[in-house]
Amino acid sequence: MAVWDRLKDQAKALQQGQAGHGASGGHGGGHGAPRSGGGGKAQLIGLFKTQLGSLKNELKSGAYRDASMAMCALVAAADGQVDASERQQVESMILSNDVLQNFPPEQLRQRFSKHVDQLTANFQHGKAEAMQEIAKAAKKPTEARAVIQTGMVIAGADGHFSQAEAQVLREACAALGLSPAEFQL
């Protein structure tokens, strides 16, 4: 728990440092504005990558693996579709993610593909299935936060958070019992 508290303090310090740069705290106001600036979000994504890396040895459970793959698929399909190049790009990010290297690549690929296929066949049904998988990580707060951070790293990889990506991340926070404000959503 001490590791998470230290990392959370680092995130708060970063948030406070960004407060003067026009990103109005993260909750409320101008809905899309904080997501398009890049600078503050890019630093936050970098911090999340660092935090996830420092927790690598703790993030080895099947619940984290499955919830993370559901989260990645949900972020990829947030706009209701996933084309082949986007699917390949997200899959490459998953397979190169330091923390996710705790798991066999074929397991990750299989779980990610299952969720993407469900989401593209019937978005609402696939989303419900993905959220059920994500909610299973709520039992362990460190894993729950790591699932959201993993989703944010995937969503922020292109330097921009779409409204749809931010929305599914907020919904995942609710499924995990976490405050979206903790992640500047």
Q: For each of these PLM feature ranges, what is it?
A:
Residues M1-L74, A84-L185:
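Small-residue-enriched hydrophobic alpha-helices in membranes
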